[in-house]
Amino acid sequence: MRSHTIKKPFERSGVGLHSGITTQVKVLPAKPGEGRYFVRVDLPQQPIIPAKLAYVNQTPLSTELKSPQGSVRTVEHLLAALSGSGINDVRIEIDGPEVPLLDGSAQQWIEAIASAGMIELTDEETTPTVMISSPISVQEGDAFVLALPARELRFTYGIDFAYSVIGNQWYSWNPASESFAEAIAPARTFGFADQIESLKQAGLIKGGSLENALVCDHQGWVNPPLRFSNEPVRHKLLDLVGDLSLLETIPLAHFLAYKASHKLHIELAKAIHGTVKVSEHHFKGFPENALTS
């Protein structure tokens, strides 16, 4: 797999889902081997926070990265967009504690990356493809995530909610046959009207709105239309891609999740890291030729 970065910088700004704070993000090209990393430009000494598994701090309803001098939250949509675009070396400057939610999906990040363009930093293979040789799994109650040996990369996700408009949904995605930009990136985050007040009282979703999240109740969707009939499960798969990209090298495997969470995604990534020899350098992207443009 080869190293890629963006051709030119781009900027986006918006409100953070949980903090409710408006932040600006500037994404810039990086040199080969620098990897994907955040820089808190609003803090003294502008601390660097690598987008690596070792820096994961907490995962309630989002994924947060933390270094000794600073942290950044809700990184999963931007990281998924970078991964889905094949970008593995990039500097991400942010002037606040949380990545903007934008419209609740990864679509605007994908569009910004496409507009910026991509360049290949090296013309030689920088790391071999990592493969899963035996099943690796984590479980909590009836929720689980596992990685199965496979000849091609695949992600399969299942969800089951007691809201009739969602119910039980499954979706399986093969990057070689469907592009991330078309099949996954447009899927928005979702929530439930009867949980909004309790989440806000817990200090969460302060920036959530009908403009950046799908909301449903037991009667139906509060803010239709959906972009896909199974948009909720596609969004869960988006989150999984973003979380697994913190491994720096996503192994060739069939990843299967059911009723999982950011916490379980990260636990699987840690289990993989402890079992499979993963590059100690930067994220190498999906296996070569796994993505279509």
Swiss-Prot record:
What is the active site of this protein? H262
In the UniProt record, what gene is named as encoding this protein? lpxC
Q: Which terms does the record give in the GO molecular function aspect? A: metal ion binding; UDP-3-O-acyl-N-acetylglucosamine deacetylase activity
- Catalytic activity, reaction form: a UDP-3-O-[(3R)-3-hydroxyacyl]-N-acetyl-alpha-D-glucosamine + H2O = a UDP-3-O-[(3R)-3-hydroxyacyl]-alpha-D-glucosamine + acetate
Q: Which InterPro entries match?
A: Ribosomal_Su5_D2-typ_SF, UDP-acyl_GlcNac_deAcase, UDP-acyl_GlcNac_deAcase_C, UDP-acyl_N-AcGlcN_deAcase_N
Name the cofactor(s) required for activity, per the record: Zn(2+)
Q: Which family does it belong to?
A: Belongs to the LpxC family.
**Pfam families linked:** LpxC
Name of this chain's protein = UDP-3-O-acyl-N-acetylglucosamine deacetylase
Q: Where does Zn(2+) bind?
A: H77, H235, D239
According to its UniProt record, in which pathway does this protein act? Glycolipid biosynthesis; lipid IV(A) biosynthesis; lipid IV(A) from (3R)-3-hydroxytetradecanoyl-[acyl-carrier-protein] and UDP-N-acetyl-alpha-D-glucosamine: step 2/6
Gene Ontology CC: membrane
* Primary role: Catalyzes the hydrolysis of UDP-3-O-myristoyl-N-acetylglucosamine to form UDP-3-O-myristoylglucosamine and acetate, the committed step in lipid A biosynthesis.
In short, the EC number is 3.5.1.108
Please tell me the species this chain comes from. Answer: Gloeothece citriformis (strain PCC 7424)
> What's the domain of life for this entry?
Bacteria
Gene Ontology biological process: lipid A biosynthetic process
Q: Which UniProt keywords apply?
A: Hydrolase, Lipid A biosynthesis, Lipid biosynthesis, Lipid metabolism, Metal-binding, Zinc
